[in-house]
Amino acid sequence: PKNYDPKKKYPFILSLHGFTSNGRGQAGFFPLADLAEKYGFLYCFPSGLDRSWNATNACCDYAKKHDDSAYLRSLILWAQKEYSIDKKKVYVTGLSNGGFMSYRMAQDHADLITAIVPFAGVGFKNWPKQPKNPLSVLHIHGTKDSTIKWKGGSIIARAYPSAEENFENWRRFNKCDKAVDASKEKIDLARRVSGKETTITRFTNKDGTVTTELWKVSGGGHVTPPTAEARERIIKWMFAQSK
């Protein structure tokens, strides 16, 4: 924010682009500058080598196996060294391939990350390992996504889970067994779909410190730019999560 004060501690958001895109493209999909001024946080839109992230076996760094997990961890650590960041409030979000990479970061670096918000990107079909620590997840997915399908599918014969299967995986990882009624919290998330098309499924762990949440965007496609209302609500959701 323009009034950045090194004596204060700020939340930090790492926002990851999709396959063939870059940081500038992600900033267009999920703008943060206005919200950073309003809520006081720091953010970064990095660009992956070859316009992709090596997230899972299904998506998406096919040509060269860059260690993007280690790179992004080092980027977060660098930001914490150079800027006044609250280490209890470090968040990763991303679209499509960036959503896959958000899950990879949660798996590999749960010690560093507070919560993730993936759009239209899931994790492994069969997880090679579980996160070391539970961390909150907000998964956002359109039912008419023809690229990363709501019901799951495969990319070059490499399977990825459905949105609901992926949600269940993380609900179990996080030991979120307590259902929270969110039926009245419908959201107008998709600018290209009329009305409040997004419904919420929410579970928490027994003491309410970890949340696993699914936003089902009925009629939403793969690239569904969120409304200003939805962007703000996502930021508020992030900042409600803390280590």
Please place each PLM-identified region on the residue numbering:
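Proline/glycine-enriched tight loop/beta-turn segments at coil->beta junctions
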Residues: 2-12, 132-134, 210
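Acidic glycine-/aspartate-rich tracts in secreted/extracellular proteins
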Residues: 2-4, 19-21, 48-51, 144-146, ...
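Serine-hydrolase catalytic machinery in alpha/beta-hydrolase-like enzymes
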Residues: 7-91, 101-104, 108, 228
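Primarily recognizes the serine-hydrolase "nucleophile elbow" in alpha/beta-hydrolase
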Residues: 28, 80-82, 88-135, 146
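Alpha/beta-hydrolase-fold catalytic nucleophile elbow
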Residues: 47, 93, 117-120, 138-141, ...
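Acidic beta-to-alpha connecting loop that harbors the catalytic carboxylate
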Residues: 48, 143-146, 153-154, 218-221
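C-terminal catalytic histidine-bearing segment of alpha/beta-hydrolase fold enzymes
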Residues: 127, 136-140, 161, 171-243
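Conserved alpha/beta-hydrolase "acid-adjacent" motif
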Residues: 146-151, 155-162, 225-227
